[in-house]
């Protein structure tokens, strides 16, 4: 995925009201930009560190700039825009990077499914095999060298696990794909200390046949892509 034009830089001041972030531009001006991340962003907020943002030419937007990347004090890069995770996953499937998800003749996004009125992030279909339902989650929480998901209690994430288990029970294939958007994360596991119910459901889903995989992202101001499999600790 290429970013055109390339992201511009600033320095983080603060994130507040969930969707707003103040940064200082390279010319010293302080501006408010959109934060496209609904999570707690635990361990992603480092005031005084470098950030990168994109700029939209849509005149209807109140905030034309969107926060895209953050740099940690250790020099790691974090993908802040969780909305890019699905596109990164789709691109990686088409490119053959995600080897577990090859051999299907069609790919669709945001398809309604399940008994809890959900939309699956990616649906792979083929006439010769069961459909493959893929739920994509962006993972950015790093604590003591370990990557965790979620970074806050997620009722929505719990619902998605129940829906995936339902698909397996119906004879379909179900996959939970963690898109790792923190360059310091080397493996992923459930954040039992943050959302014990999610962790319990994740273990249950795995034992019922839901496949759980993770892929690391290589991100820069010029572009991003999924590059390699990342271990999941269950």
From Swiss-Prot:
What HAMAP family has UniProt attached to this entry?
A: SfsA
Question: What gene name is given for the protein in this entry?
Answer: sfsA
InterPro entries tied to this protein: SfsA, SfsA_C, SfsA_N
What family is this protein classified in? Belongs to the SfsA family.
Q: Signal peptide: which range, if any?
A: none
Lineage, opening ranks: Bacteria, Pseudomonadati, Pseudomonadota, Gammaproteobacteria, Alteromonadales
Q: Which domain of life is it from?
A: Bacteria
Q: Mind telling me what this protein is named?
A: Sugar fermentation stimulation protein homolog
GO MF annotation, one: DNA binding
């Amino acid at each position: 995925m290429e970013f055109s034009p390339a992201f511009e830089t600033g320095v983080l001041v603060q994130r507040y009201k969930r969707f707003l972030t103040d940064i200082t531009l390279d010319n010293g001006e302080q501006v408010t930009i959109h934060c496209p991340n609904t999570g707690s962003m635990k361990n992603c907020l480092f005031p005084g560190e470098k950030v990168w943002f994109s700029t939209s030419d849509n005149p209807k937007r109140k905030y034309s700039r969107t926060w895209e990347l953050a740099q940690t004090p250790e020099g790691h890069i974090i993908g802040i825009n969780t909305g890019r995770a699905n596109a990164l996953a789709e691109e990686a499937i088409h490119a053959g990077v995600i080897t577990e998800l090859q051999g299907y003749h069609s790919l669709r996004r945001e398809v309604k499914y399940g008994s809890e009125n959900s939309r699956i992030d990616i649906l792979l279909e083929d006439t010769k095999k069961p459909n493959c339902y893929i739920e994509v989650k962006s993972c950015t929480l790093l604590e003591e060298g370990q990557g965790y998901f979620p970074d806050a209690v997620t009722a929505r994430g719990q619902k998605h696990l129940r829906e995936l288990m339902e698909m397996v029970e119906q004879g379909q294939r179900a996959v939970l794909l963690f898109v790792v958007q923190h360059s310091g994360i080397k493996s992923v596991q459930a954040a039992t200390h943050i959302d014990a119910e999610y962790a319990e459901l994740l273990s249950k889903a795995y034992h019922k046949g839901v496949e759980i995989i993770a892929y690391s992202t290589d991100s820069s101001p010029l572009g991003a892509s999924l590059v390699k499999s990342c271990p999941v600790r269950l």
